């Protein structure tokens, strides 16, 4: 996240405390100052100072709480104030860019999906900035105070410095300084994250893994990867938070991957590779119901659910390959649950048992026997994943402090 700074010790304490108080108000509001002091384990004087600054900045508001059966003056509670604060959430995928204006509660104000061609003479960075400018121009009457920009996209990304080293599909991308360029252009902090990691954060904050402390989330789409929540926090390794299972070699003699290696899991389990294998198998078998119709993920899943042997075998094979890599991760992280986000989840009754069986066969029984395989709540489209980046920046205080000081 390029927008994060390295504050001094005292400033870091202030940032952390403010973020903790904001999180409690956001999650529990309306909540009293007394309860905030107890829950945040901060002195009442500290709570008073932090809350006063948030009230003056119109980030929180006071609300009378009338408790049932109580007499006398109502208690005063605090709630976040979100409608006057907006951020831009951007999602870049293969051939498309999603742009959405959301308020700080993550409520959608307006969203667009536009074409972003894979091969064009104009560099991708320049095209992204142009789309942002035009989006703001089109929707300037709806825009309240802009706080930040959140960007999620596939590729090999240095999230700390906002640099995209490589991207699938967009071959001209090499060391693209996306975060820095957009921050200089707009004047607001920019948070950039791999789409799978951001999606993992969104599920933890708003979705299927909310409340779980240890989770592995696997995405099987045009790209394959995983995010890990351990002890309630997204796992970070250096400047990356993505577990690159998609670039784990499963076949040294396999197809060349965009990362430069051969036989990566992504070249076998991504939906493009799955459809390619299905077409190859169809050319050798005339008995499948997939003949005589367009071959898509939907038609493949539908055929599998209707008992087509070829379709079932293809999807089971994906589950076995993914499960083999997940077994290693289960041994490392001992998760409570594994979330699967994939268009192939339309055949979850086939895919998920194949993944679970592979894990049970190859992981430690003590770890694998209680692990649950479930579907994600959200999909890999749209801009909800970016909402998690902004929410996290408010909770850790990095964005909150900037808003208080502006």
Question: What are the language-model segments listed below?
Answer:
Residues 103, 159, 229:
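Short, acidic, Ser/Thr-enriched surface-loop or helix-capping motifs
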Residues 62-64, 190-194, 228:
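General beta-strand structural signal in soluble alpha/beta enzymes
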Residues 77, 87-91, 146-150, 215-219, ...:
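Short glycine-aspartate micro-motif
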Residues 27-28, 170, 206, 221:
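Short helix-capping/turn signature of helix-turn-helix
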Residues 111-214, 350-360:
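Glycine-rich phosphate-binding loop and adjoining helix at the ATP-binding site
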Residues 108, 164, 234-235:
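Hydrophobic "anchor" residues
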Residues 1-145, 265-406:
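ATP-binding/phosphotransfer module of carbohydrate and carboxylate kinases, centering on a glycine-rich
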Residues 212-269:
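Glycine-rich phosphate-binding loop of actin/hexokinase-like ATP-binding domains
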């Amino acid at each position: 996240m390029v927008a994060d700074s390295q504050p001094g010790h005292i400033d870091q304490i202030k940032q952390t405390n403010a973020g903790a108080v904001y999180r409690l108000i956001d999650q529990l509001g309306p909540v009293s100052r007394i309860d905030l002091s107890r829950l945040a384990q901060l002195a009442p004087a500290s709570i008073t100072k932090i809350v006063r600054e948030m009230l003056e900045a119109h980030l929180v508001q006071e609300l009378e709480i009338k408790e049932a059966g109580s007499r006398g003056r109502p208690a005063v509670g605090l709630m976040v104030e979100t409608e006057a604060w907006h951020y831009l959430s951007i999602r870049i995928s293969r051939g498309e860019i999603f742009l959405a204006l959301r308020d700080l509660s993550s409520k959608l104000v307006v969203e667009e999906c536009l074409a972003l061609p894979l091969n064009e003479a104009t560099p991708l960075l320049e095209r992204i900035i142009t789309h942002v400018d035009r989006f703001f121009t089109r929707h300037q009457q709806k825009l309240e105070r802009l706080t930040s920009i959140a960007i999620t996209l596939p590729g090999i990304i240095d999230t700390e410095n906002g640099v995209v080293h490589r991207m699938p599909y967009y071959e001209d991308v090499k060391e693209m300084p996306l975060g820095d360029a957009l921050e200089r252009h707009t004047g607001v902090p920019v948070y950039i994250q791999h789409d799978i990691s951001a999606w993992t954060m969104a599920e933890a904050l708003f979705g299927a893994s909310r409340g779980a402390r240890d989770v592995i989330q696997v995405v099987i789409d045009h790209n394959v990867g995983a995010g890990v929540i351990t002890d309630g926090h997204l796992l970070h390794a250096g400047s990356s938070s993505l577990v690159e299972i998609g670039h784990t070699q499963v076949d040294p003699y396999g197809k060349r991957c965009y990362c430069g290696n051969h036989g990566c899991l992504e070249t076998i389990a991504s939906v493009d590779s799955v459809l390619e294998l299905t077409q190859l198998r169809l050319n050798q078998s005339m008995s499948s119901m997939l003949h005589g119709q367009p071959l898509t993920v939907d038609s493949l899943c539908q055929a599998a659910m209707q008992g087509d042997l070829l379709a079932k075998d293809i999807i089971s094979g994906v589950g076995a390959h993914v499960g083999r890599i997940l077994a290693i991760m289960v041994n490392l992280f001992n998760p409570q649950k594994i979330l699967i986000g994939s268009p192939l989840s339309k055949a979850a009754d086939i895919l998920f048992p194949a993944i679970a069986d592979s894990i049970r066969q190859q992981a430690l029984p003590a770890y694998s026997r209680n692990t649950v395989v479930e579907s994600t709540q959200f999909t890999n489209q749209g801009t909800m994943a970016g909402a998690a980046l902004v929410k996290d920046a408010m909770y850790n205080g990095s964005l909150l402090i900037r808003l208080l000081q502006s």
